[in-house]
Amino acid sequence: MPRAAILDVDGTLVDSNDAHAQAWVTAFNEAGIDVSYDRVRRAIGMGGDKLLPHVSGLSAESQVGRRVSARRGEIFRSDFLPHLNGFPRVRELVQQLLADGYRVVVASSAESQELDPLLEIAGITDLLQARASSNDANRSKPDPDIVVAALNRSGAERSQAIMLGDTPYDVEAALAAGIEIVGVETGGWGPDDLRGAAEVHTGVAELCAHYPDSIFARLAAASSLP
């Protein structure tokens, strides 16, 4: 029976959440809309279609909303994306998951044109079995559609899948999809914010250090029993 490790990207594998927030704030400011950085930062991890009305009251389908969203993408890709870094030991974690028989799939609210370079930055493009982005779902996080799309592409049952994410929106999406999730604090949220996660680690590096005791290792061991 296949097992799946479903990985979020922004804030989990790549240190990009602050950059996303600043790109949104700049785009809002250019449109004459006053939205604080802190308000936007706490919404990073939602899909852009949900973040936009959440922080500004603008409909994502409105003319202004579409303009702000498009400009945010331009700013992020030109001003921030070239300078981002992956978190330590990301490739090592994915290699360990593969060695334990997991099919590794990413589930990200990013659009494909941003997801591809982010995966290059994380250093795992060649290791992935599949991916699901906002282009593959009707509803973005915290709705479960992207996670379900990733799960379906993995071929695993819900009981054989674990997600890794950094925001409360990842936790909500995973639980709504019926799978367990491991949280990391590198996105800016702590254990209280990630309540509902089976485990919370300071980051991928700590998860790697404690991998033999993790839920990933336990599921792999249990699934290997005759």
Language-model-detected regions and their locations in the chain:
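Residue-level marker of regulatory loop/turn positions in helix-turn-helix DNA-binding domains and
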Residues: 86, 107, 139
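Asp-based, Mg2+/Mn2+-dependent phosphohydrolase catalytic module
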Residues: 1-3, 95-98, 111-226
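Conserved phosphate-coupling serine/threonine residues in phosphotransfer and NTP-handling enzymes
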Residues: 12, 108-110
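N-terminal helical cap/lid subdomain that shapes the substrate entry/recognition surface
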Residues: 2-91, 95-102
